[in-house]
């Protein structure tokens, strides 16, 4: 009888440990996620944003389209051209600089292609399109405030 009680005690402790371990893994994964909120609405990208050299990297087409910026991809030269009424942004993959209205701007994180998807630095793109950007490190959320003057 004592052996059976010991067995159930160990089984209970084991189940509790497994439960806490799984909860910690799920919690850690959720903390690792980066959220992007534009004018109070959470943006959903088809691939997840990530951090590179302290900069949040996002899929270029998703962020430009969310900001209402026209975008084109040049596959031969591996470059992105984005334009709105006042700004033209030219970015080349792998380069640590970009051009905004013809002026060279150094980047903290170079745009890159991962699994066939092009990622660009969110703050650089958003601010140069005319948005205000802030980061909440506690919730791992980027807040973008943007007024598209065309609408």
Model-inferred region functions:
Residues 4-10, 16-151:
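Primary recognition of N-terminal secretory signal peptides and signal-anchoring hydrophobic helices
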């Amino acid at each position: 009888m004592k052996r059976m009680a010991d067995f159930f005690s160990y089984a209970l402790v084991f189940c509790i440990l497994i439960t806490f371990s799984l909860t910690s893994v799920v919690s850690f994964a959720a903390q690792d996620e980066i959220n992007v909120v534009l004018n109070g609405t959470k943006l959903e990208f088809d691939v997840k944003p990530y951090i590179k050299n302290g900069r949040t990297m996002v899929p270029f087409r998703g962020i430009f389209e969310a900001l209402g910026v026209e975008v084109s991809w040049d596959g031969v030269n591996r470059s992105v051209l984005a334009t709105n009424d006042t700004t033209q942004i030219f970015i080349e993959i792998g380069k640590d600089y970009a051009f905004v209205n013809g002026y060279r701007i150094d980047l903290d994180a170079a745009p890159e292609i991962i699994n066939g998807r092009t990622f660009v630095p969110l703050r650089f793109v958003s601010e140069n399109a005319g948005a205000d950007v802030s980061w909440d490190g506690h919730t791992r959320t980027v807040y973008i405030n943007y007024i598209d003057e065309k609408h």
